[in-house]
């Protein structure tokens, strides 16, 4: 699987927090501290899957969207490229990506989806792998269905509602382990 990671050794909310909890929070965090450390936005690194039913976790260091004029697109493209390269180098036959940076880091969902599909298609033109793009929220699902009518949706919306209630505070803000808060509006 691919996880959306922070550049510093901290655990965020959303996908990052869910992956750490499922894989084994302390074990994964200690591994990152000991063997990985700081990674620039747009970079990627690989860890064992630990408690997950996955051989590896590929962590894509997600760019924060500012205004589109600070290299965000190239950093986001780099996340997909480097993640796919790591997967290929490690013999991965199938991989699941979240829609990187389109949650708490504020990347516009439509643009993020276009970039994901572009980079995945470019990779598949040269290599063979089963690639799944997993969208979590209803807005991203609707957007995907609009742009790609044959999109296969497989998310229990009740699960999404429960996860949102437990993951994020009622005022719409999520708090990462760093103590920083981020707005999670659509």
Where are these regions (language model features)?
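Macrodomain-like recognition of ADP-ribose-binding/processing modules
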Residues: 1-186
